Structures are given as structure tokens and as C-alpha cells.
């Protein structure tokens, strides 16, 4: 049976860089990490191949398992969590969410 490691989300560490957050999670004794998109901390629209390589290296170095990539709930609007959602009646808004989820899948494949 597949065991999901006890993990911590980088969403709670947004004042650190994503690399610093990986080290902080490892230092705290967690086995896994949720890499959470955040406008200033881990912005899916600004992720480079270099950063993905650095993330892979930090995870490997610290023995941390990436448990999840989180697409944010407040990424597009602070006033309405989860909007635009996949159920948004506005087609352009729904396409924004779909694009964000696709970016999360690509990041998951890369790390």
C-alpha cells in the first residue's frame, strides 16, 4: 500500500523562497511537502526551468517527497476564494483556472 508521507505546505512559509521553504520543512522533520503556488512565493507564471531544477535538487538533497502541487484558492481574487473556479459561468474565468491547473500538472511532472 502506498503511504503518503507526513507533509507540510509551503503556503505557510511564503515569506521564504520556495527553496528555503523546502529546507525549513526538512529541518522541521517532515518527510513530504506540498508545493503551493503563491503570487510572490512560487508564482506559476514565473517558474523557470532553472528553478524547477533547483527544487528537484533541494528535494533530493533533503530527502523530501513532493506530495502535492497546490493551485491556489486566492490566486486571481482575494475577495472570492476559489474563483474563478472550474464551475465559473464566465468562460474566460474558467479558462484561467484550467490554465492554472495545467501549470500545476506540468510542475508536478517536472519535480
Residue spans of the language-model regions?
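N-terminal pre-domain/capping segments
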Residues: 1-110
Amino acid at each position: 500500500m502506498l503511504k503518503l508521507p507526513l507533509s507540510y505546505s509551503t503556503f505557510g512559509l511564503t515569506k521564504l523562497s520556495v527553496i528555503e521553504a523546502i529546507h525549513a520543512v526538512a529541518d522541521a522533520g517532515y518527510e513530504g511537502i506540498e508545493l503551493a503556488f503563491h503570487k510572490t512565493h512560487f508564482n506559476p507564471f514565473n517558474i523557470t526551468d532553472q528553478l524547477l531544477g533547483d527544487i528537484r535538487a533541494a528535494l533530493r538533497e533533503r530527502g523530501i517527497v513532493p506530495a502535492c502541487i497546490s493551485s491556489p484558492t486566492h490566486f486571481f481574487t482575494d475577495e472570492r476564494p476559489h474563483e474563478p473556479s472550474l464551475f465559473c459561468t464566465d468562460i474566460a474565468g474558467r479558462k484561467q483556472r484550467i490554465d492554472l491547473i495545467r501549470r500545476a500538472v506540468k510542475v508536478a511532472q517536472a519535480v
